[in-house]
Each structure stands twice: as C-alpha cells, then as structure tokens.
Amino acid sequence: MKRIAFVFSTAPHGTAAGREGLDALLATSALTDDLAVFFIADGVFQLLSGQKPDAVLARDYIATFKLLGLYDIEQCWVCAASLRERGLDPQTPFVVEATPLEADALRRELANYDVILRF
C-alpha cells in the first residue's frame, strides 16, 4: 500500500480547502493506516482552538481534527518555522498533538511518502 501524506497549507475558513482536506483524510484513514498529516505555512492556523468561524459565516470543522486519534491517525507534524513566522508558540495547546519539525527535517519526513495531497 502506498504511504499517503496530507499537507494543510491554507488558513481555515477562507476557502473550503481545509474542510475538504480533513474530510479526505478521515475517509482515507478507513482504507490505510500508512498516512500522516503535515501543517505548513498558513495551515498551522488549522491547529488553533477557540476559532469563531460563525463570525464569517463558515462551518466549524476545526473541532473535527480532535477525532484524528479515534481514526488512529497519529503521525502529525507542524513546521516550526511556520509557527515562528506567524508568532505562534510551539508549546501552544493545539487541537491535534503535532510534533514541531524544522523545515529541513519536515521535508525529509515528507519525502518518505508516495502520495502527497495538499489542501
């Protein structure tokens, strides 16, 4: 079976990309256990709790990220440089337990996957 990586690189609620990526991730987890999730660039904002999507008339899907553990999705990484660039602390309690990696280490980890889906 191919190893599949899901890369979240867009901010939540501005487009449907994050919600669609999460839906695809959960659906794919029913078919394979060999997948991982990466949060880079503005995608790191997907990890923040306390968002108020109703203020922009968007659906609150961020809480659904908390289900990753129930779906046995345990390989989650976040780009440490992206966090710093956006003024976020790696010690922030995110909705998903994601391991911070520097950009080079994150690229090396991502290279281990056969299929990369970016949202």
Curated annotation (Swiss-Prot):
It is found in: Cytoplasm. The keyword Iron does not apply. The keyword Cytoplasm applies. One of its GO terms (cellular component) is cytoplasm. Keywords: Cytoplasm, tRNA processing. Belongs to the DsrF/TusC family. Heterohexamer, formed by a dimer of trimers. The hexameric TusBCD complex contains 2 copies each of TusB, TusC and TusD. The TusBCD complex interacts with TusE. This is Protein TusC. It comes from Shigella boydii serotype 18 (strain CDC 3083-94 / BS512). The lineage of its organism: Bacteria, Pseudomonadati, Pseudomonadota, Gammaproteobacteria, Enterobacterales. The gene is tusC.
